A protein has these predicted regions:
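A general alpha-helix detector
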Residues: 158-159, 205-209, 236, 252-256
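NAD(P)-dependent Rossmann-like dehydrogenase/reductase catalytic/cofactor-binding core
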Residues: 2-3, 26-28, 170, 174, ...
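Hydrophobic/aromatic beta-strand patches that form the interior of the parallel beta-sheet core
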Residues: 31, 78-80, 94, 146-148, ...
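Acidic/polar active-site rim loop that often engages polyanionic ligands
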Residues: 25-28, 35, 153-162, 234, ...
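Rossmann-like NAD(P)-binding element
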Residues: 38, 53-60, 65-121, 128
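Rossmann-fold dinucleotide-binding core
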Residues: 120-191, 199-200
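NAD(P)+-binding Rossmann beta1-loop-alpha1 motif at the extreme N-terminus of oxidoreductases
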Residues: 1-53, 114
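Amphipathic alpha-helical segments at domain termini/boundaries
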Residues: 5-7, 21, 25-27, 71-92, ...
Length: 295
């Protein structure tokens, strides 16, 4: 199997731009794709802010080395508004677009026709079954179609889940493990099950925290403090929910409830969360969630 050196990332949002950044830092040639100049510009901005942070830490006090590092990483990144053109030489295609199965399936059906035969296709979905997305491609591609699930903030979080469907070949799985290690992350593998490993455990825990609040058993602040100081979490469940996005949290659990593959008690909705989402309070990105960030 060919080494992964050329990567195309579809989606320039928080996750997509983070994946572009870590691949470019690992010296891969990366094309970042989105549908508008504004979306690509936003992705570039996220990368340059994060790169400055990484450079400052790597070359503390040496501005020249910091600049050389940033320039070298940025030189590995190309922007494109055409996914079809951008995959023409890709060893790996990673999709990080909206969590909509039809949109993802249409994208991959189109890319399957134009990408090189050896290209590995991956989705960074956190909530949709990989095999349902992969089924939109040819049988040959399904052997090269896996989940590659990064965590937010991508440049800082050290884990990648490689989600292996029954169709994925050993060679492809090995290539993805090698790529994950090359970009400085630790891979774990799991079957194509709801939430994979991290979200399967993390999301029900967070929802129970929301329901503790619904039942007025403890305050947001006290639950967060308890989990940080009593369980060693870097963020409490409400801080983390605001960080991930309340709409995302709701989308994941509503999807699981509909699928019916998870114990119903674990996917009980939370009134506090539902109310905030319906009022447009989605967490940090909208300025308010469980906490108010405008103050
Ligand atoms: N770019 C580059 N580096 C970053 C960064 C960024 N955007 N954000 C943080 N970092 C680095 C910092 O430079 C620092 O590095 P160091 O330890 O080597 O010095 C390290 O990360 C810690 O950052 P800070 O000291 O500035 O801040 P904190 O100690 O408060 O850490 C945090 C910030 C890493 C976000 C930490 O609070 C954390 O780990 N929170 C939990 C995040 C989490 O659980 N993410 C997973 C969410 S679930 C998910 O993504 C799945 C999805 O499918 C829903």
């Amino acid at each position: 199997m060919k080494d992964i050196n050329s990567v195309t990332v579809i989606g320039a949002g928080l996750m997509g731009s983070g994946i572009v950044q870590v691949a470019a830092q690992a010296n891969c040639k990366v094309t970042m794709v989105d549908t508008s100049d504004a979306a690509l510009g936003n992705g570039e901005k996220l990368i340059s802010t994060s790169l400055k942070r990484v450079a400052r830490k790597k070359f503390d006090g040496d501005e020249q080395q910091q600049k050389a590092f940033i320039d070298k990483v940025l030189a590995n990144i190309t922007l494109s508004k055409s996914a079809e053109q951008a995959v023409s030489e890709a060893d790996l295609v990673v999709e990080a677009i909206v969590e909509n199965i039809d949109v993802k399936r249409t994208l991959f059906t189109n890319l399957d026709k134009v990408a090189p035969e050896h290209s590995i296709f991956c989705s960074n979905t956190s909530s949709l079954p990989i095999s349902d997305i992969a089924a939109a491609t040819s049988a040959a591609r399904q052997e090269k179609f896996a989940g590659l699930h990064f965590f937010n903030p991508v440049p800082a979080m050290k884990l990648v889940e490689i989600v292996r469907t029954n169709a994925v070949s050993d060679d492809v799985f090995q290539s993805l493990q090698d790529f994950t290690t090359k970009v400085g992350k630790t891979p774990v593998s799991c079957k194509d099950t709801p939430g994979f490993i991290v979200n399967r455990l993390l999301v029900p825990y967070m929802f129970e925290a929301f329901r503790v609040l619904d039942r007025k058993e403890a305050s947001i602040k006290d639950i967060d403090t308890a989990m940080k100081l009593g369980a060693g979490m870097p963020m409490g469940p409400f801080e983390l929910a605001d960080f991930v996005g309340l709409d995302t949290m709701k989308f994941i659990v509503d999807g699981w409830a509909k699928e019916g593959k998870i114990e119903p008690a674990l996917v009980q909705p939370s009134k506090s969360l539902d109310d905030l989402v319906s009022e447009g309070h989605l967490g940090r990105k909208s300025g308010k969630g469980f906490y108010d960030y405008k103050k």
